[in-house]
């Protein structure tokens, strides 16, 4: 059975963009409050009082449009992936589509699959454009993740997102998709029930049965189907709930950490959930050279992974400077203390 996912028409990334809020809190500051002295990351991004997954998605989408240099009316789909969208009943995609000027001739939907909701939207965009149904489609992954006060997730749950505009492969695409593959099972490693404010995690399922099993199987199957090895890739971006997990995956697969570090941002902005690998790939595209090949593997609890192989094209040299680069946002910082952080994240119950 053919496992590789590849559309009828070759497609690529016409434009991409990321956004990370400027506020930061040091892991040490969170640890001070809860009496913890060892931390999985250095610091994380915190959304401002007027920011949420929707506003992050809009900023990322606008940056993607700047690089794409296309009329937003040509975008026939705006698909938004998040597990922290601001409305329980009301699509976020419609607001983003309106904000960027893509309405009314456009399909919109909100995708959910924990931390791989954004790449799930991307898989759909690839198929939508690759089938000939549309010239362009936009996929966005963004989150303002929450962690229960004092829980280890509070140290890593960050904020940020990225958007990718998919179009038919041409001289205008900054990178093209060689193929993709999705690997999914029913694994209860992480969940949040309706009306609950904070997620829960099934500790014994978190590592090996969920994250490592799915990412490694997705990566290996994609490479086997494409006839590639780890040596054929110049960069690798894996889902990054922390710094340790993606580096462990790289070691298991035999990928030098030097190929992983450029897209590994969790240590300085936190885990951006649906935005994690998408923000990482945007950072890699900001520095990659034409001909570079990128291995991109997401993970979403519940559980599943999407794996992509993309090859950078000549257009990247011109387009990368048309919008703020990912590290421009990462390096733009304003530190806050735990009291302001708790206020911004609405942890105070009045």
UniProtKB/Swiss-Prot annotation:
Chemical reaction(s) catalysed: acetoacetyl-CoA + acetyl-CoA + H2O = (3S)-3-hydroxy-3-methylglutaryl-CoA + CoA + H(+)
EC number: 2.3.3.10
Pathway the protein acts in: Metabolic intermediate biosynthesis; (R)-mevalonate biosynthesis; (R)-mevalonate from acetyl-CoA: step 2/3
Domain of life: Archaea
Residue numbers annotated as active site: 83 (proton donor/acceptor), 115 (acyl-thioester intermediate), 239 (proton donor/acceptor)
Alphabetic keyword roster: Acyltransferase, Isoprene biosynthesis, Transferase
One GO BP: farnesyl diphosphate biosynthetic process, mevalonate pathway
MF (Gene Ontology): acetyl-CoA C-acetyltransferase activity; hydroxymethylglutaryl-CoA synthase activity
Gene3D superfamilies: 3.40.47.10
Enzymatic class: transferase
Positions that bind CoA: 204, 244
Residues that hold (3S)-3-hydroxy-3-methylglutaryl-CoA according to the record: 115, 156, 206, 239, 271, 301
Alphabetized Pfam families for the sequence: ACP_syn_III_C
Protein family according to the UniProt entry: Belongs to the thiolase-like superfamily. Archaeal HMG-CoA synthase family.
Stated role: Catalyzes the condensation of acetyl-CoA with acetoacetyl-CoA to form 3-hydroxy-3-methylglutaryl-CoA (HMG-CoA). Functions in the mevalonate (MVA) pathway leading to isopentenyl diphosphate (IPP), a key precursor for the biosynthesis of isoprenoid compounds that are building blocks of archaeal membrane lipids.
Quaternary structure, from the entry: Interacts with acetoacetyl-CoA thiolase that catalyzes the precedent step in the pathway and with a DUF35 protein. The acetoacetyl-CoA thiolase/HMG-CoA synthase complex channels the intermediate via a fused CoA-binding site, which allows for efficient coupling of the endergonic thiolase reaction with the exergonic HMGCS reaction.
Protein name as catalogued: Hydroxymethylglutaryl-CoA synthase
UniProt organism field: Thermococcus onnurineus (strain NA1)
Lineage of the species this protein comes from: Archaea, Methanobacteriati, Methanobacteriota, Thermococci, Thermococcales
């Amino acid at each position: 059975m053919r496992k590789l996912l590849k559309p009828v028409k070759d497609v690529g990334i016409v434009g991409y963009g990321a956004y990370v809020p400027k506020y930061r809190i040091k892991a040490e500051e969170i640890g001070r409050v809860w009496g913890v002295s060892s931390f999985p990351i250095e610091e994380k991004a915190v959304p401002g009082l007027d920011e949420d997954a929707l506003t992050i998605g809009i900023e990322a989408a606008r940056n993607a449009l700047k690089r794409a240099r296309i009329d937003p009316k040509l975008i026939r789909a705006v698909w938004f992936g998040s597990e922290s969208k601001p409305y329980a009943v009301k699509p976020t995609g419609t607001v983003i589509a309106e904000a960027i000027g893509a309405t009314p001739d456009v399909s919109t939907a909100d995708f959910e699959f924990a931390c791989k909701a954004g790449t799930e939207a991307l898989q759909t965009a690839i198929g939508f454009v690759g089938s000939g149904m549309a010239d362009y489609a936009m996929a966005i992954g963004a989150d303002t993740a929450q962690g229960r006060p004092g829980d280890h997730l509070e140290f890593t749950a960050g904020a940020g997102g990225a958007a990718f505009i998919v179009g038919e492969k041409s001289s205008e695409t900054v990178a093209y998709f060689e193929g993709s593959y999705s690997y999914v099972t029913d694994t209860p490693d992480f969940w949040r029930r309706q009306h609950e404010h904070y997620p829960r995690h099934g500790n014994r399922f978190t590592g090996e049965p969920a994250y490592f099993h799915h990412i490694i199987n997705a990566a290996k199957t994609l490479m086997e189907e494409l006839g590639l090895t780890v040596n054929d890739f110049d960069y690798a971006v894996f889902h990054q709930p922390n710094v340790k997990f993606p580096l462990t995956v790289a070691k298991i697969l035999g990928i030098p950490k030097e190929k992983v570090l450029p897209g590994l941002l969790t240590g300085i902005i936190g885990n951006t959930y649906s935005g994690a690998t998408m923000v990482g790939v945007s950072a890699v595209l900001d520095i990659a050279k034409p001909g570079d090949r990128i291995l991109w593997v997401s993970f979403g609890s519940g559980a599943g992974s999407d794996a992509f192989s993309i090859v950078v094209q000549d257009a990247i040299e011109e387009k990368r400077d048309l919008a703020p680069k990912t590290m421009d946002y990462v390096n733009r910082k304003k530190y806050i203390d735990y009291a302001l952080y708790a206020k911004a994240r609405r942890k105070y119950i009045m």
